[in-house]
Amino acid sequence: TAEVLKAGEKGGTGIGGLVLGGALGAVFKVLQGAFRFWKEDPTATVALGPKSVLGVGFNLQPALLGVGVIVGLPIASLVFLGGVLGWVVGIPLYTQFAGDVYNAAHGGPSLFDLAGGKDLLPAVVWSRRIRYIGVGAMLVGGLWSLVKLRKPLTRAILQGLRSARRGVGDTEVPRTERDLPFSLVGMGAILLAVPMAFLFNAVLGNLAAAITIAVVMVAVGFLFSAVGGYMAGIVGSSNSPVSGVTILALLAACLALLAFAVTGSVGPPAAIIVAAVVCVAASISGDNLQDLKAGLMLGSTPWKQQLMIMVGAVASAFAIAPVIQTLINGAGATAEAPLGNIAAPQANLMATLSRAVFSAEGLSVQAPMIWIGAGLAVVLIVTDFLLKRAGSPFGTPVMPVAVGIYLPVGTSVPIFVGGLAAWLGERAYRRWRRYDEEGKVRGDWHAAAESGGRMAVLFASGLIAGEAILGIVTAFLVAQDVPTGFDAGFRHDWAGIALLLYFVFLAWYVAVRPGLALLRKNRGQ
């Protein structure tokens, strides 16, 4: 974001890369979303035997490619590793050995029957079983992140308490570090929690339970906002797996309700309300942190940004609800199908989870997967510690791997490819710097590498913005039943893959272009 703002201020080649990426991302989205030349997420199922299957896919989204370029190969590789563990390792093992894949179990049909055959079996196994490994890993990884962040968090809280006595105009604190008074933030949180407690009391009919759940909501919202912000820094706010954080909040709310012996039909709605609040908090935390980090890089005043963030939150609260209701009405909502033809897989998943917790069986189906994910997270934490102790430049942070397991496998592939393009650009500059040391070529390769990296980030940002803007337009056309489909009678998925790979080449070329210019200059001397 900061690079985009700098490019807009300076103009020239920087803004050109941004515009190019935006135009290409927009064109790609129009061809995909409006004319439907190819699927957004082409997938395939591979049979490894009579029982075992695995799923492969490639999500055709330029935005994910841009995310990979921005986060770099180390993080992109770990996200891809998570996808491989979930889909190439986890699903084949589960379909081979689990008894509920081909036989009815847990009071319902088999996973094979739910999938309607082997073609969709990997997706069903992942959504109902394997992704909970990612949830368990996120739980441990999120708690570990908070442990690692305990000193900065404590320092920030203490600084906030000190600022409560000084105010935003205190000249002892540098302008670029002045936040809103902690007293104002704390009072705002309390004032917002009070009406939520009344809402919970209306649902539960138990004032003590309502107050407790409101406190749990604030505490869990604070913790998972930090986790959500951390994950947004890994894969971007648009692709941050907030639903995983929301599931954790849902489980925490369910446990708190069970402590008050809340059962029956009132438990799930109350838990869903808590999860909804935490979901919003975790979602906007990533955006807010990105805004504040961009402001820090540009020299903005934090308390002014924070004030405008609050204004934006209030405005969004009034704007989002009618927009969502309009989309639901346009999807043919009825009393029997409240969401119409909207699939809403995450919402259905959370509704199923909340009902399961308050049922007689509880989480007996998902618990083993969650424990496996927690164990995997511990292994990754220990491995990361040993690698750092050995002085290795590489590490195994939990969150990227957990995100890779939780997201569809096709999502991790373009992120990895984008990270690979960025790494190839960096590798080219390392080789050219070595040539400079050997006296083969001359030039300021450090400045060239910095310029190339900045251009690649701007190009990637353009891909993300272009796809997002045209995605909104396409969604509006689809909601209005505007006929945008195009059917030429054959599949076009490979065309979409080829075009996306061309974007990969462009991302690499944009990164190495300053270096190529230096090489041409050397040849001319």
Model-inferred region functions:
Residues 1-525:
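Alpha-helical multipass membrane-protein architecture
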